[in-house]
């Protein structure tokens, strides 16, 4: 008995992971948890890129299209830069305010 996993299965996993990250962004109040949720969303996009690259109509067995893999690596690089800048900002804010709770960030209001 062989079970084949198609494009729909990968897209379902990607959508579930994206929804989980989106839920974390909207519900969590800690900046670090929000950054982790954004990383989940970016990884869901990577899963979709790789799945579309694998199951695309132009992906013949004899060819090796790397469009999805290159896009996924690009998203990983952007995510690494985003997390580095985000954590630097979190550390700077924590040193000044002694909190990482987003509900207490009202110093940009007039």
From Swiss-Prot:
GO molecular function: NADH:ubiquinone reductase (non-electrogenic) activity; quinone binding
Reactions catalysed: a quinone + NADH + 5 H(+)(in) = a quinol + NAD(+) + 4 H(+)(out)
InterPro entries: NADH_UbQ_OxRdtase_chain4L/K (IPR001133), NUOK/Mnh_C1-like (IPR039428)
Disulfide-bonded cysteines: none
Enzyme class: translocase
Subcellular location: Cell membrane
Pfam families per UniProt: Oxidored_q2
Membrane topology reported for the UniProt record: Multi-pass membrane protein
Top-level taxon of the source organism: Bacteria
NCBIfam families: PRK05715.1-2, PRK05715.1-3, PRK05715.1-4, PRK05715.1-5
Protein function: NDH-1 shuttles electrons from NADH, via FMN and iron-sulfur (Fe-S) centers, to quinones in the respiratory chain. The immediate electron acceptor for the enzyme in this species is believed to be a menaquinone. Couples the redox reaction to proton translocation (for every two electrons transferred, four hydrogen ions are translocated across the cytoplasmic membrane), and thus conserves the redox energy in a proton gradient.
Assembly mode: NDH-1 is composed of 14 different subunits. Subunits NuoA, H, J, K, L, M, N constitute the membrane sector of the complex.
Protein known as: NADH-quinone oxidoreductase subunit K
Organism field: Desulfitobacterium hafniense (strain Y51)
Lineage of source species: Bacteria, Bacillati, Bacillota, Clostridia, Eubacteriales
